């Protein structure tokens, strides 16, 4: 019975560590996506006024 408890405890801790690592990776991926979206918005803000001036002038 003692070895079963140790095995279950070990599996629990390994699973917890695995979930923690997955969560960190997911958060990092979301941050990368957010950064990409912000960069695209900055490019659009810089690009559209230039195109507008070229088309009107």
Curated annotation (Swiss-Prot):
Keywords: Amidation, Amphibian defense peptide, Antibiotic, Antimicrobial, Cleavage on pair of basic residues, Fungicide, Immunity, Innate immunity, Secreted, Signal. It is found in: Secreted. The keyword Nucleus does not apply. Residues 1-22 form the signal peptide. It comes from the Eukaryota. Pfam families: FSAP_sig_propep. The modification Serine amide is found at residue 56. InterPro entries: Frog_antimicrobial_propeptide. One of its GO terms (cellular component) is extracellular region. Residues 23-46 form a propeptide. Expressed by the skin glands. GO terms for biological process: defense response to bacterium; defense response to fungus; innate immune response; killing of cells of another organism. Transmembrane segments: none annotated. Its main location: secreted. Coiled coil: none annotated. Belongs to the frog skin active peptide (FSAP) family. Temporin subfamily. Antimicrobial peptide with weak activity against Gram-positive and Gram-negative bacteria and against fungi. Has been tested against S.aureus (MIC=15.0 ug/mL), B.pumilus (no activity detected), B.cereus (no activity detected), E.coli (MIC=30.0 ug/mL), B.dysenteriae (MIC=60.0 ug/mL), A.cacoaceticus (MIC=75.0 ug/mL), P.aeruginosa (MIC=25.0 ug/mL) and C.albicans (MIC=15.0 ug/mL). Also shows a weak hemolytic activity. This is Temporin-ALk.
């Amino acid at each position: 019975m003692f070895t079963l408890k140790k095995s279950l405890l070990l599996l629990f801790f390994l699973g917890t560590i695995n979930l923690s690592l997955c969560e960190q990776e997911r958060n990092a991926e979301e941050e990368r996506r957010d950064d990409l979206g912000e960069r695209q918005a900055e490019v659009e803000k810089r690009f559209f006024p230039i195109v507008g001036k070229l088309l009107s002038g």
